Design a protein with these regions (language model features):
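Cysteine-nucleophile amide-bond enzymes
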Residues: 1-163, 167-178, 187-265
């Protein structure tokens, strides 16, 4: 049981597959050594040279602003939703700008990001959040600026560069700002990102599941609150790796990059 990734039309070409893999590799590469700060209920912080409360300043270069998140991580404090989008944008832009040296495509991506004057909003399709209730039908139909959706993905099915979402199903801890769930990038080798370097730059799959479960025990930092950590059994790890409809944490949706240059975006 898994999922299909279909390359059709102009994308039915080995070059489309190769480029898609390379873009995913770039997303993973930019997720590997992060140490941003988590706002933990406070307002996000931004480098004011480039950003005004999350909005790109009119004269700021988006290429420079994105690189700055990784060069000066101490100048920002970001939740996992924003952090995920930053890594994905940087991975895609860096691939076309620096690796492929396709400035025309990089500029087209920037134009797409700026199409509504809010570069960090809407890079993923609205259907990514189809599990949330009530459902806004217009939002569900909204296409992503840089990503499309794969639905009904089987448990344990991940491809490096996937945007994955884990829901915190515990009523009390999920009401704490920032702990409603976890936006994550799958890095390969059973690992997910660690935006805040709380666990040596990555979480193994079982660690990720245990992390989310233990929010109900007040474990909001694995490194600081490890004494409160409850270790889950193999049966519990299996259960919580299922979808929320089945009593688990893992949403069946995956947001993945378009086949840039081989399909409209």
């Amino acid at each position: 049981e898994g999922r299909e990734t279909i390359f059709k039309g102009d994308a039915c070409h080995i070059d489309a597959l190769k480029e898609h893999i390379q873009i995913r590799q770039m997303i993973v590469a930019w997720s590997e050594h992060l140490h941003w700060s988590f706002p933990d209920g406070e307002s996000a912080q931004w480098n004011q040279r480039y950003w005004d409360q999350g909005n790109l300043k009119p004269k700021a270069s988006l290429d420079e602003a994105m690189r700055d998140f990784f060069i000066n991580p101490d100048k920002c404090s970001l939740g996992c939703y924003t952090a995920t989008k930053i890594v994905i944008i940087q991975g895609i832009l860096d691939y076309f700008r620096r690796v492929k040296k396709d400035d025309a495509m990089a500029d087209a991506i920037i134009k797409r990001l700026k199409s509504d004057d809010d570069v960090l909003v809407g890079i993923e399709p609205g259907a990514m959040w189809s599990f949330q209730k009530p459902i806004n039908l217009d939002e569900q139909k909204r296409l992503g600026k840089l990503l499309k959706i794969q639905t009904q993905v089987a448990p344990m099915n991940f491809i490096p560069g996937d945007w994955v979402y884990f829901v915190n199903t515990d009523k009390d801890s999920s009401e704490k700002d920032g702990y409603e769930g976890s936006n994550s990038i799958y890095m390969g080798r059973a690992s997910f990102d660690d935006f805040y370097n709380d666990n040596e730059h990555h979480y193994l799959y079982n660690e990720k599941i245990q992390n989310i479960y233990n929010w109900r025990n007040g474990v909001f930092s694995r490194s600081r609150h490890f004494q409160r950590m409850q270790i889950l059994s193999a049966e519990q790890l299996h259960q919580f790796g299922l979808s929320p409809e089945e009593g688990g944490f893992l949403v069946k949706n995956r947001a993945i990059p378009y086949f840039f240059g081989f399909e409209p975006f």
